[in-house]
Amino acid sequence: MQKYTSEARQLLALAIPVILAQVAQTAMGFVDTVMAGGYSATDMAAVAIGTSIWLPAILFGHGLLLALTPVIAQLNGSGRRERIAHQVRQGFWLAGFVSVLVMIVLWNAGYIIRSMHNIDPALADKAVGYLRALLWGAPGYLFFQVARNQCEGLAKTKPGMVMGFLGLLVNIPVNYIFIYGHFGMPELGGIGCGVATAAVYWVMFIAMLSYIKHARSMRDIRNETGFGKPDSVVMKRLIQLGLPIALALFFEVTLFAVVALLVSPLGIVDVAGHQIALNFSSLMFVLPMSLAAAVTIRVGYRLGQGSTLDAQTAARTGLGVGICMAVVTAIFTVTLRKHIALLYNDNPEVVALAAQLMLLAAVYQISDSIQVIGSGILRGYKDTRSIFFITFTAYWVLGLPSGYILALTDLVVDRMGPAGFWMGFIIGLTSAAVLMMLRMRYLQRQPSAIILQRAAR
């Protein structure tokens, strides 16, 4: 029992800074929305539309680079720290290549925006302008993620938290300058949010790079003189590990976007109730997601040390802590669901629907916690391909079709409206949780030599 208690302490010590970093990131989005809304409703809508395109594109790159964390954790655990700098350098090359692709997609996103049904031309122009300003921050964001993944792979999660709050502090005044046109800068409205956010990502990257160069704990991990050329072998391995994670993230984000589109014709009350429940659930999701990042680090580190039993302990402890957290957040959601809904809106119909959907959200929080921590465990074992297949099957083959049938057809029961899609979420997330656990058990039952050989690749 003592080893599980000790492991839980180490996991929470890693996870809490990640949680706070995510809070800072969420707050940046909130600040952008509020400050753009203070300028005009059109500018706020433009930022919302632009963000809905930015997120899937940038999260694809973010997911691709997540492969660095278990790689670095495993090298750190095995005492091969001299190889870490080369892996990080190739991560920067990969981030550079992906940045170019993301920037091309975002530059041409106007075709997608202007093809939206009945969109106001002025709104479309502002959304395109916002994206074309923001896209210059894509390299800064992805380079920052490489540096952050280096720190987290070395079990240093606090720098990411500090840089997150630094970004938030810089974002507010820079937003003010570019939205309203102060200190000789042009008055850009919502487009100014894009300029500010792009600048903030570069500030965060430069600050993180400065930390890495001066941190005593990383003195033995220094990039070689010059930047070196791309190493096709290392980059291919990073892509093999990261691409399934990137695709899984992309399919998860697009699933919720598709559901939002399917709910939109049902009416204002249904859309508002669905959005409130989804927004609150996203806030609760920060807890298991951060714990999953910590579990990846611990499992990778233990496998690097050559101890498959300690890796199992880290995995089981992470699941136990995650389930306990989910039970607490589920009880909190059920107990205070009406009060939470009132924080968003005071329309009685909207509040009633949001409170009903939050009951379903409370049910799926446990499944959601298990599946996301399970994904973190599999990343630690470098078994990322299975994450993609499980996510795609659970969300798009089981969850979305069942949600569509329950919400919009009479095939099984009378049309349930938004609640049907939330039942689909429960089916999809529970399926993902079961499949993740089955895959984890299969991996852990393999001979230690095979597990360690996979981890060392």
From Swiss-Prot:
Cross-referenced InterPro entries: MATE_fam, MATE_MdtK, MdtK-like, Multidrug-R_MdtK
Predominant localisation class: membrane
Lipid bilayer topology: Multi-pass membrane protein
Assigned keywords, A-Z: Antiport, Cell inner membrane, Cell membrane, Ion transport, Membrane, Sodium, Sodium transport, Transmembrane, Transmembrane helix, Transport
Localization of this protein: Cell inner membrane
Pfam families: MatE
GO-annotated biological processes: sodium ion transport; xenobiotic transmembrane transport
Gene Ontology terms for molecular function: antiporter activity; xenobiotic transmembrane transporter activity
Cellular component terms per the entry's GO annotation: plasma membrane
Taxonomy, superkingdom: Bacteria
Sequence intervals crossing the membrane: 11-31, 53-73, 93-113, 127-147, 160-180, 188-208, 243-263, 276-296, 314-334, 350-370, 387-407, 418-438
HAMAP family associated with the record: MdtK
PANTHER family assigned to the protein according to its UniProt record, in alphabetical order: FMN_FAD EXPORTER YEEO-RELATED (PTHR43298:SF2), MULTIDRUG RESISTANCE PROTEIN NORM-RELATED (PTHR43298)
Function of the molecule: Multidrug efflux pump that functions probably as a Na(+)/drug antiporter.
Family listed: Belongs to the multi antimicrobial extrusion (MATE) (TC 2.A.66.1) family. MdtK subfamily.
NCBIfam families on file: matE
Name assigned to this protein: Multidrug resistance protein MdtK
